[in-house]
């Protein structure tokens, strides 16, 4: 058993860290291009869908009273082969997800720092290695860092949103084409990936203090926090650069909005938020997927090396 159990703040940070992990940076322009002035509504709809999924996941986890998420649900239902395949697909997906987060971290930080062409790749590798080392130090260490990172990045994004909303003009939210209801729905579908991450909590169930109570109430807080910051950013960023620029700038739209707000300090702050977002997502994904791998290995569906723990009580592989 791990030496440190996760309280409300740590569980909230893992979920929010997994969700606000770069999605808002890459999807905002796509959502505005589809939904126009109704982009915030798309984020709300996406959040409601995520909450429905998260509520079901939490309720099933509490009812089963065991970790593992969809893997354990399928296994307990007798679909062992499907559960095994699902576990392998999930774990492979989390490895690729961490690689994407690390690539984004390297791209953002390398762009600001300049330097040789290999620097972004080196920074990406360093981010992965640093988070692996942190997770090997135990749940308490990883959770404490996750809380600090998530609070910092949300504060930066909230500050950017406040600056933009102080200049609010509804006319600036419009795009050339009228999006209509279909555009709002397409926008909501495209932002659902920005809410991906809440499912990590099902793998951490055994690590939680008073796990039934905590798992039963964490989803609205975590998903609601992500949805709130997404909606505020969706309303604020067009006030600073205009919808056309947000659409054309793609994943650097928020960085450009930060520069429009505060010049170079704003650019650096938003770049820091992007870097922290990817790092927190790497940390949350490594922390939770290692526990999924341990659960699968305990059932004999992965090599026993994945079930081993180090002296800190953390999965060591």
Protein language model features and the residues they cover:
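Juxtamembrane helix-boundary/capping and inter-helix hinge elements in multi-pass membrane proteins
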Residues: 34-37, 63-67, 76-82, 206-215, ...
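Hydrophobic, small-residue-rich membrane helices and short re-entrant helix-turn-helix hairpins
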Residues: 1, 137-147, 198-228, 297-308
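Membrane-interface "cap" regions at the ends of multi-pass membrane proteins
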Residues: 1-38, 50-51, 55, 67, ...
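TM-loop-TM module centered on a large, flexible mid-protein loop between adjacent transmembrane helices
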Residues: 72-75, 79, 110-112, 220-283, ...
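Hydrophobic, membrane-embedded alpha-helices of multi-pass small-molecule transporters
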Residues: 6-25, 127, 164, 176-240, ...
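Hydrophobic transmembrane alpha-helices that form the core helical bundles
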Residues: 30-34, 42, 51-128, 133-136, ...
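Membrane-interface loop-to-helix entry segments
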Residues: 119-167, 178-181, 219-223
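Membrane-interface helix termini and inter-helical loops of multi-pass transporters
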Residues: 27-34, 104-115, 168-178, 243-252
């Amino acid at each position: 058993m791990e030496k440190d159990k996760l309280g409300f703040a740590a569980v909230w940070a893992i979920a929010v860290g997994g969700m606000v992990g770069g999605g808002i940076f890459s999807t905002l322009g796509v959502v505005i291009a589809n939904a126009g002035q109704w982009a915030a509504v798309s984020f709300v709809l996406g959040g409601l869908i995520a909450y429905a999924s998260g509520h079901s996941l939490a309720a099933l986890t509490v009812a089963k009273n065991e970790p593992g998420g969809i893997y354990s649900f399928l296994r307990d239902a007798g679909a062992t082969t499907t559960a095994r395949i699902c576990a392998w697909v999930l774990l492979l997906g989390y490895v690729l997800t961490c690689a994407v987060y690390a690539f984004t971290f390297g791209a953002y930080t390398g762009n600001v720092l300049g330097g040789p062409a290999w620097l972004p790749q080196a920074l990406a590798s360093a981010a992965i290695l640093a988070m692996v080392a942190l997770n090997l130090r135990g749940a308490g260490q990883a959770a404490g860092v996750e809380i600090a990172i998530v609070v910092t990045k949300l504060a930066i994004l909230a500050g950017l949103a406040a600056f933009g909303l102080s200049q609010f003009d509804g006319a600036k939210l419009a795009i050339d084409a009228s999006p209509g209801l279909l555009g709002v729905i397409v926008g909501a579908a495209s932002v659902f990936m920005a809410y991906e991450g809440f499912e990590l909590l099902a793998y951490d169930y055994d690590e939680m203090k008073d796990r039934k109570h905590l798992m039963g109430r964490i989803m609205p807080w975590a998903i609601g926090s992500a949805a709130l910051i997404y909606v505020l950013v969706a309303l604020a960023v067009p006030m600073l650069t205009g919808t056309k620029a947000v659409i054309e700038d793609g994943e650097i739209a928020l960085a450009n909005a930060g520069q429009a707000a505060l010049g170079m300090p704003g650019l650096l702050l938003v770049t820091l938020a992007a870097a922290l977002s990817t790092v927190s997502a790497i940390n949350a994904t490594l922390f939770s997927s290692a526990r999924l791998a341990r659960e699968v290995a305990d059932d004999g569906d992965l090599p026993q090396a994945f079930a081993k723990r180090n002296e800190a009580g953390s999965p060591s592989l």
